[in-house]
Regions:
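Intrinsic-disorder/low-complexity signal
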Residues: 1-220
């Protein structure tokens, strides 16, 4: 059965296999990656281990497994082993690099013997797409086709689903160099001209690039 965006189909099997294909057009320099998010009733992951991707290929209990390949991936879901707090599993494809979804010549998901879905790629500017989802409904499981684009790459998508993404440590700020003239002007305006003369003298003698400690006795 060929699904259209928004359509769903019941899943009768206890274990399903999903095959994704995303061959790229000529000149495509990015790298498509399949990412899965095991979501609770609030649409968020309950922990970072519920984020299945190239660095974490299976869920802790082994209910969801991801196998990645060149411009393709396969997913195996043991529906009867999915934790009770997981309401749905979002199936996404993210482009790593400067390219977008429009750089793919095909973007499809197939459940052999059940259904398949092909998402539109032409003219799309998004770097990520929610291709479909496997979700609970009245005590059973269903597969829904989506093809919903998402602006941004993997990081904003993961954050949207509640993944705690590590941020790079900020670079320490360089200490500000205090202007001697400003300090003197605040405390003793009479010494401003002295500081200016000292600066001119250092420049003439090519010593202005050297740093040295100096002390001024300010007679209040």
């Amino acid at each position: 059965m060929n699904l259209q965006s928004g359509q769903n189909i019941p899943l009768q099997q206890s274990t399903i296999r999903l095959n994704l294909q995303y061959p790229a057009k000529s000149g495509f320099k990015g790298e498509p990656d399949t990412c899965l998010f095991m979501l609770n009733a609030q649409g968020k992951v309950s922990g970072d281990s519920d984020f299945i991707f190239y660095n974490n290929l299976s869920s802790p209990e082994g209910a969801v497994r991801l196998v990645t390949g060149s411009q393709q991936a396969s997913i195996e879901i043991a529906l009867d082993r999915v934790p009770a707090n997981v309401s749905k599993i979002a199936i996404t494809v993210v482009i790593d690099g400067e390219d977008t979804i429009s750089g793919l010549s095909l973007l499809s998901i197939q459940a052999p013997g059940i259904a398949d879905f092909q998402a539109e790629t032409q003219g799309r500017s998004e770097k990520a797409i929610i291709l479909g989802e496997v979700y609970r409904h009245n005590g059973a499981w269903k597969l829904r086709a989506l093809g919903q684009g998402f602006n941004g790459g993997l990081e904003p998508l993961a954050i949207n689903y509640g993944v705690d993404v590590a941020q790079p440590a900020p670079q320490p700020a360089k200490p500000a160099r205090i202007s001697l003239e400003k300090k003197l002007e605040t405390r003793s305006p009479r010494l401003v001209s002295l500081a200016k003369k000292a600066s001119v003298s250092l420049t003439k003698n090519k010593l202005d690039t050297l740093e040295a400690a100096a002390a001024f006795v300010l007679d209040a």
